[in-house]
Amino acid sequence: ILGGVDLIRRVHGRPAWALAWPLLTAPDGTKLGKTTGARIWLDPDRTSPYQFFQHWMNTDDRQVRQFLAQFTLLPMDEVDAAVASHEESPGRREAQRLLAREATRLVHGADDALAAEEASAILFGSPIDGVSVAALEAVAREVPVCEVARGDLAAGVPAADLLSSPNFLTASKGEARRAIAQGGVYVNGERVGEEHVVSADSLLHDRYVLVRKGKRSFGLVRLEA
């Protein structure tokens, strides 16, 4: 660091300053970094706003106050109030949500932060009523996507056919049918039966259909452009 400061002074003839920051460590003292799987990038092409948001959502309870103080511009009285509320109901992870929201807003802007938070809620089981286009586009960057022609969807596509589309949610139509028969397939949050047909009526914002298999396996059907 000092070498870089000196090089700038010698080459450009003007002073430079360096900022040093204490190493981030896990509660057990392990350094947080790429070797521990904790690497994130500011570049949205390397770490999407959704992934960035989730990184902060996964903050350990023991460190959430520290990170709120270090990585947001919130007043400390607001930080302390959030932590106190979190300690009363830790399962709701409200302090982590505040940290994720503020850190993502600072790096990616308010719109992407809101879309990332909404996408996170969807992918963790919240109802999709009123879901925004931006949130669905954020989801599309994180889950398998099945492109469907408008004409095919207008005619109706059996749910099993969609699930077994190449690189989507099941490896075969038989697996898709079994998942549906067992009650484990949802279209736009509603459980579907063996005869269910996905049609244009299912479209969200005239372009997307959200499909879930089991508790956490999501896919997005998207109309071809």
Kindly give the residue locations of the regions a language model identified.
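Internal alpha/beta core interface subdomains
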Residues: 1-6
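Conserved nucleotide- and phosphate/pyrophosphate-binding catalytic cores
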Residues: 8-225
